[in-house]
Curated annotation (Swiss-Prot):
This is S-adenosylmethionine synthase. Catalyzes the formation of S-adenosylmethionine (AdoMet) from methionine and ATP. The overall synthetic reaction is composed of two sequential steps, AdoMet formation and the subsequent tripolyphosphate hydrolysis which occurs prior to release of AdoMet from the enzyme. ATP binds at H17, D171, A172, K173, K237, F238, D246, R252, K253, A269, K273. Binds 2 divalent ions per subunit. Binds 1 potassium ion per subunit. Pathway: Amino-acid biosynthesis; S-adenosyl-L-methionine biosynthesis; S-adenosyl-L-methionine from L-methionine: step 1/1. It is an enzyme of class 2 (transferase). PANTHER family: S-ADENOSYLMETHIONINE SYNTHETASE. It catalyses: L-methionine + ATP + H2O = S-adenosyl-L-methionine + phosphate + diphosphate. Homotetramer; dimer of dimers. Belongs to the AdoMet synthase family. The keyword Transferase applies. The lineage of its organism: Bacteria, Pseudomonadati, Pseudomonadota, Alphaproteobacteria, Rhodobacterales. Pfam families: S-AdoMet_synt_C, S-AdoMet_synt_M, S-AdoMet_synt_N. Coiled coil: none annotated. It comes from Ruegeria sp. (strain TM1040) (Silicibacter sp.).
């Protein structure tokens, strides 16, 4: 039987974290190419360190002349990301950082296994397992610890960028421990925030005084109590941040990107990957399905797994676990999912409208638990499959 009284912790990192700088650049490259050609193939990886950004991987457009033209725009794309994040420090500045572009054309051997041909449907871009998760403990149907860890950093980024707290730097991390009573989140027992700051004279107490009002307005009323333990910049000064402080790589924050450790993870990162790659698209589909199961009232909590083989279109397996909260047997939900959504790579992309430049915005503050947007962004957060699922169980 599942535990109902416990404390669970999740962390988030800001858009200025070194790994998130890399995720942002990789997704910006993807967006630029997919805006030119919706079926563009992209697998872009980024490495960032002091005064240096290296971008590599595989890309493909049907028009090689256009591809060559876009290779000349990579430097500009990367600098625009760094500028928007806010890096203007001596050893990592959007104007002076050295950008190296090592992107090259995608392997024809990969393409032949993935592309549709004749009566053969498009296959998955790789083998793998992908998980989706949803829980009704928050309005976004996300676990509370990760949802509010993101919210804290997103709010601090807002006040940094709008000039309210210009003393904050782009690099930051948050972590909250949430106590559950009868399976519901009720209070924050501890809160950790480490944020870069531009004034060397500021102490940990000074930083707490600056950020505490914004943290309090972000969390649900009553969750911060007199017993909540605060750790704000616990090591003291945090002036040198971002890739100058620690090297960054694309794809190193996969738990931050998903459910904060509250659900399994298949291991595949998202950023820089076009939607033919099921690491990304099938994980989005799994979240979409799990969220719709919960939104439909079929369960209070749902974990869903999909699996694929490279070159094979249909998923090899679909697994549902409602953690003893289901209104119907889990097997019935699995059957309903097969009826309600085409889970081939092309079916997922069509259903969720993934062949659009909607990825750069996902690179920080979580791929899940965000509001669907009018241009198709975060389409996997829609709850438009609920009636179909209820009718199919």
């Amino acid at each position: 039987m599942s535990r109902t009284n416990y404390t669970f912790t999740s962390e988030s990192v800001s858009e200025g974290h070194p790994d998130k700088v890399c995720d942002r650049i990789s997704d910006a490259v993807l967006d630029a190419l997919i805006a030119e050609e919706p079926e563009a193939r992209v697998a872009a990886e980024t490495f960032a360190t002091t005064n240096r950004v290296v971008i590599g991987g595989e890309v493909g457009l049907s028009d090689q002349a256009k591809l060559k033209d876009y290779m000349g725009k990579i430097d500009e794309i990367a600098r625009a990301c760094i500028k928007d994040i806010g890096y203007e420090q001596d050893k990592f500045h959007h104007e002076t950082v050295e950008i190296t572009n090592l992107l090259h054309e995608q392997s024809a051997h990969i393409a032949q296994g993935v592309d549709a041909a004749g009566d053969k449907d498009e296959g998955a871009g790789d083998q793998g397992i992908m998980f989706g998760f949803a829980t009704d403990e928050t309005d976004a149907l996300m676990p509370a610890p990760i949802q509010f860890s993101h919210a804290i950093l997103r709010r601090l980024a807002e006040v940094r960028k709008n000039g309210t707290l210009p003393v904050l730097g782009p690099d930051a991390k948050s972590q909250i421990s949430v106590r559950y009573d009868a399976g519901k989140p009720v209070e924050v027992t501890s809160l950790v925030l480490s944020t870069q700051h531009l004034d060397e004279k500021l102490t940990s107490a000074d930083i707490r005084a600056l950020v505490e009002p914004y943290i309090r307005e972000t969390l649900p009323e009553g969750w911060l109590t007199d017993n909540t333990v605060w750790h704000v910049n616990p090591t003291g000064k945090f002036v040198i941040g971002g890739p100058d402080g620690d090297a960054g790589l694309t794809g190193r924050k996969i738990i931050v990107d998903t459910y904060g450790g509250a659900a399994p993870h298949g291991g595949g990162a998202f950023s820089g990957k076009d939607p033919t790659k099921v690491d990304r698209s099938a994980a989005y589909a799994a979240r979409y399905l799990a969220k719709n199961v919960v939104a439909a009232g079929l369960a209070h909590k749902c974990t869903l797994q999909l699996s694929y083989a490279i070159g094979v279109a249909a998923p090899l397996s679909i697994y549902v676990n409602t953690h003893d909260t289901g209104a119907v047997p889990d097997e019935n939900i699995e059957t309903a999912i097969r009826k309600c959504m085409d889970l081939t790579p092309r079916g997922i992309r069509t259903h969720l409208g993934l062949n659009k430049p909607i990825y750069q915005r996902t690179a920080a503050y979580g791929h899940f638990g965000r509001a669907p947007e009018a241009d198709g962004g975060f389409s996997w957060e829609r709850t438009d499959l609920t009636e179909a699922l209820k009718g199919a169980v």
